[in-house]
Regions:
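Interfacial helix-cap and linker-helix signal at transmembrane-aqueous boundaries
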Residues: 34-35, 66-67, 158-164, 237-238, ...
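Central cavity-lining transmembrane alpha-helices of secondary-active solute carriers
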Residues: 50-65, 254-266
Length: 405
């Protein structure tokens, strides 16, 4: 048997992000179906999103405590098993249990556990691989979440057209095969240490570092800027253009994800010629312009173009911030990646919720809510411009005793 190499580890991590895209994006395509098939209110169905992100937040928080003790390989295998089992439970539990909604909640919690672990594990596994062009590889890695999202929406839509949406449980089982197969792959690929034993920073050390909190703000802004448009892109397309739900999904979140993927692949090929700070500043500028088009353009197609521009711009925000933090705090270890994932997920929850609440406050005007979303890229740009991160300096090395730099 040929000895597996870092490239195989990277391939397994690519599939890991595709798995996360499946567990995050598949169920929302079926919300209307769940409503009609099981007679569950849309409010209750919408709570599955809260369960999904809530469990992921909890996993992000706890992972910094147990991943280093258990090891990356068993945790990565477990993450994919949770994801696959959760998708199978989604297919069968609502039919088996007397209260279908309970089945949806249990399935969501199980696959969200897998998704949360994947989010914490995959980036540090790739960061530890012996690649020279770390930030380019990180950007390419995160593009696979975007391509996974495009694939889930497009292929699921095609399946529903050809086989009928009533057969969605079959598709859930098909999607479950991907994490199960990748769990086997992770049993064999090489896993490299992120930092030497005993040199990884403790959570308390990170919390005492001013630089760490700047990275937290950047991650919250990155998650909020991305999801504030992504989660509402379908509704924006449907309302603005008067198209069907299927077309709205393809023109909204599918186009948004494709633009994110394009940005991440492009940066993976050209990013070594830019400083991360410069690239992130360009991204925030494009994001601000895209939000302005979405919120203030009187022409619906220009608003949709604004959604696409936001997708293109936010593409490098999440992986770029992770790379910036990893380079600045090389002893951060698993705790750094787990807490950054937690901050990003907080942004993913807070941004869309704020947009929805403000839209409701202004008689359902989605543009008003999206206009509020401008706050996040503006804040991110301000942190990049005016914080100490703008200066070229040595990495932030943490003193384990007091957290000082």
């Amino acid at each position: 048997m040929t000895r597996l190499k870092p490239g195989h580890t990277l391939a397994a991590c690519f599939i890991g992000y595709i798995t996360q895209a499946i567990v995050v994006n598949f169920a929302p395509l079926l919300f209307v179906t769940f409503h009609s098939q099981y007679d569950i209110s849309l409010t209750v169905i919408g709570l599955t999103i809260t369960v999904n992100f809530g469990v992921q937040l909890l996993v992000d928080l706890l992972a910094s405590k147990f991943v280093d003790k258990i090891g990356y390989r068993p945790c990565a295998v477990a993450a994919h098993l949770f994801s696959g089992i959760g998708l199978l439970l989604l297919a069968f539990l609502p039919e088996i249990l007397p209260v279908p909604a309970v089945g949806l909640f249990i399935a969501s919690a199980v696959y969200a556990t897998g998704g949360g672990l994947i989010e914490v594990l995959i980036s540090p596994i790739v960061e530890a691989c012996p690649f020279d062009n770390k930030k380019s590889v990180m950007s390419l890695l995160h593009s696979f979440y975007s391509w996974g999202q495009v694939g889930v929406v497009a292929l699921s839509t095609l399946f529903f057209v050809l086989a009928g949406v009533e057969n969605w449980a079959i598709l859930a089982c098909v999607w479950a095969a991907i994490p199960f197969l990748n769990a086997v792959f992770f049993l064999f690929v090489p896993i490299y240490p992120l930092v030497k034993d005993g040199e990884s920073a403790k959570v308390t050390s990170l919390l005492k570092s001013g630089a760490f909190w700047l990275f937290v703000v950047l991650m919250i802004c990155a998650g909020s800027a991305e999801q504030s448009v992504s989660q509402w892109a379908s509704a924006f397309a449907e309302e603005g253009l008067g198209v069907s739900k299927t077309v709205g999904d393809l023109l909204g979140p599918c186009l948004f994800a494709a633009m994110m993927g394009i940005a991440r692949v492009a940066f993976s090929r050209t990013g070594e010629g830019f400083s991360l700070r410069t690239a992130l500043l360009i991204a925030t500028g494009g994001c601000i312009a895209g939000y302005a088009l979405c919120a203030f353009s009187p022409v619906a197609w220009l608003g949709l173009a604004g959604c696409a521009l936001v997708g293109l711009s936010v593409g490098i925000m999440w992986p770029g911030t992770i790379s910036l933090a990893s380079a600045g705090m090389p002893r951060g270890g698993t705790a750094l990646f787990a807490l950054l994932a937690l901050a990003g997920d907080v942004g993913c929850m807070a941004g869309p919720s704020a947009v929805g609440a403000l839209s409701d406050a202004f008689s359902g005007d989605l543009r008003t809510g999206i206009a509020f979303g401008l706050f996040f890229p503006v804040l991110m740009g301000a942190v990049l411009l005016f914080s100490g991160l703008k200066r070229k300096k040595a990495p932030v090395l943490l003193n384990e005793k007091d957290g000082s730099k």
